[in-house]
Every structure is written in C-alpha cells, then in structure tokens.
Amino acid sequence: MRALSCDFFETYIKDAKQTEIAPVPKYIKKRLYEHIEGILAGGAADDERVLEAIANHVITESYHHGNRTTKHNAIRNGLRYARVPSGKACAFCLMLASRGFVYHSKTSAGEDKGHYHNHCHCAVVAGNLKMKVSGYDPDGLNERMNELAASLGIDDWAAAAADKELTKVLNRELAERDRCWVLNGKVPFVEFENKLAKKNAHDHEIEQAKRLSRHGIKCVFQVDYERVDKKGTLIGKPDLSNGIELKSLTNTSNLERRIKKSLHNAKRKKGFKSCNFDATGTSFSNDEIYKAINSQAMKKRINRVSFIDRNGDYHVIKIRGATAPGQNPEVFAPH
C-alpha cells in the first residue's frame, strides 16, 4: 500500500518530485506489539482466529500508512491534501473531511492528529483548493452534519466531534442515517419490501416517509403484521423495516393523550425501535411537542422518539438508557 501510494502520487500529480515512503511513527509499532500481545494472551498462537486478527491489524496499518505517505509527499511537493471519507466514517473523521483541502504543512498536518481507527477507510487525497474529487463535497458534508447535529440540539457539530462524549452521540445518530445521504447528499428513495406492503401503506404514511427521507432516514415499508399460528393470530410490526413506527399528530386537540396512546401501541409491536411523529399539519409549537413526547417516552421507557415540525425540520429526542420517571435522564432537546 505504501509503494502504491508513491506510484499513484507520481502518476496523477504533475511535476511531482521524487516520492518517498513516510517514516513509520514509533507509536504504530508499539500499538501493533500491544495488539499482538493482547491477542496471544487470549489464545494459542496457531489459532486461526488469532492469526486472522493479527493479519487484519497489519492490513489496516498498511492502509493507514499509505495515507501517511500521501500526506508526506503532498507536503514535500508544496501541495495541500484533504481527507475524503467513505463507508462508515465516524463523526471525527467527517469533521476532518469537512475542512476540505486545508492541510498544507507539517503544522497544519498536525491538526488531524493522525487520527485513524479500526475499519477506517478514509482516503488522503493530494491537491489544491480548486481541486474537485468525485463524490466529495466538504461544504455539503458540513451542511448535512450541521443538520444532523441540530436535530439533537447540538449547535456546533465540529466542536462536538472533538468532544469524546458528544462524538459518541453523533456516531449513534450517524448509524440511523443513510450513508449516501451523509457523504454526498443523495436522498434515499422510499421503498416497499413487497407488493402487499405497498398496498397496505397509507398515503399520509408515504408522505411522512418522504419527509423523513429528506433528512437521510432510509424508509422501507414492510407488512406491519405477522401471523403467529395456524388460527391466523396476528401480531403488529412497525411500519418501517428499520423498526420505526409512523404516527401523525394531525387533527388532535389533546397532544399528550395522542402521544401517550401512540407510544403505547407502538411499543407493543414486534421489532419496534423508535417512533416518528408528523407534526407538519398541526398548530402546536416545538416546545409543546417536545414536552409531551419527553413526558410520555419517559413513562413508557422508550429511549428514542423523533418528530417533524411544521417547517419540515427533523428533531430527535433521546432519553439515554430509557430510565424510569424521576431519575433525570439525559435528554437532547430540539431548538
């Protein structure tokens, strides 16, 4: 991977100076030795799983050093470089990627702290401020991550990504969003598992799913019931295959009662994970909706509920650990 990085650099960078492989940081060797020692302590050296784990670690470090080599040669040639995310990039990686081609010296290169983790597939690309990389839009990425953070009540997502605990919060929310939407802004299509699921889906539910999709939530309708015996006994399932139950707040005068009933019914469904309320057709304020959802979610011990407000904005209310009422759970409130 390191030699390939040099070859690639010389091929695609015009008038590039002679490239060289970047020095291996001392902490890399130490980290590898510690990893091997930890593996050997847990099993025999000839165990295939142990050898596979060691091989995977070596492959990962080789890939990462390819990135270090690209950075090293970019600086030697007076170029900038950017960190281009792919796959399941974490919030911290996305924060680095959203800066674009800003790194151009050993000082600025130190800003990313050499951050790499297991299964990180971010790629370092050398270039300049005007360079365009297919599928890489740092400004768009920053906008979407700002939107994602705002749905959690976080004002500055880049600062949050540098905070250990808030990074975990962002990463959990990233797991709920479609990766193509996160990385390149492509809105996922609303889909149906089969013809029956499409037939059973109500028009207002499909419209609600379309609104969710605009915020990067992948919506696939499933048949919302399951036969459990020969007598034809049915049990309910969530509207969407990812465990989301769709509920509307339209035409309700008693907000608390509607939410209470909706969460009660939703939680009983097999595979239920969260509930989304559509408030686009209501006159309730975000604060009123938040308070009602928070109150009922605590009582029902449901740790994730979301809603779409009158303006089409998406809000997530997370009650960490779904603690019992009166235990002051951590709540992320909408603005």
Language-model segments: which ranges?
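Metal-dependent nuclease catalytic core centered on acidic motifs
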Residues: 178-227, 249-335
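Structured loops at beta-to-helix junctions and adjacent beta-edge loops in soluble globular domains
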Residues: 86, 96, 125, 247, ...
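Domain-core detector
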Residues: 1-117, 127-181
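A short, glycine/Asx- and small/polar-enriched loop/turn
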Residues: 233-238
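Conserved catalytic cores of phosphodiester-cleaving nucleases, focusing on short active-site segments
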Residues: 240-250
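A short beta-turn/loop motif at secondary-structure boundaries
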Residues: 84-86, 227-232
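Structured core elements
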Residues: 92-94, 121-123, 243-245
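C-terminal edge-of-domain segments
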Residues: 115-127, 315, 319
